[in-house]
């Protein structure tokens, strides 16, 4: 038997995970020549972005065991968020427009990339592409207006890499590519 000895016990900080939202088509966003999508960092304005994987379980009891077993059967991820209503930020404007225009259904779906800045190869970082419905729970007045809500995942997340230099997400070969609500909506437009 061999033991792994870790000599570097660094802990990821909130600045080690970055979130980039697709803001293609948002008013005032200039598209980069040759790029399909335009992403912007959800940093300034965002005061909270908390992931809850929400593992769903199923309990099984066997007649020969006193203790039940719980198996993970699926996930229902969601992301609680708070951001200041900085209307000059395109990703904030995109979220605010959902509640302002009382959008429903596929019109509430946004795409964002979650990037692990501590997992880098060259200019690419390990990342997940997420399609999520935006549910705004409140617009609070605390001198500054604060948007509070939840992003609810729509389908499976797509694993891949995000090139910080080019702003391009590439799905990994082992991630099955399924059409999402957001992609269907974009194809209709």
What is each PLM-predicted segment?
Residues 161-189:
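Intrinsically disordered, low-complexity terminal/linker regions enriched in Pro/Ser/Gly
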Residues 63-129, 159-164:
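Extracellular/virion structural assembly segments
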Residues 2-80, 132-145:
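Solvent-exposed edge beta-strands and adjacent loop segments
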Residues 1-5, 186-189:
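Basic/polar N-terminal segments that are highly enriched at the extreme N-terminus
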Residues 27-30, 36, 45, 107, ...:
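Compositionally biased, intrinsically disordered low-complexity regions
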Residues 98-104, 131-135, 153, 168-173:
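Short, low-complexity, polar/charged sequence segments that are solvent-exposed and flexible
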Residues 44, 113-159:
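Short beta-strand and beta-hairpin "edge-sheet" elements
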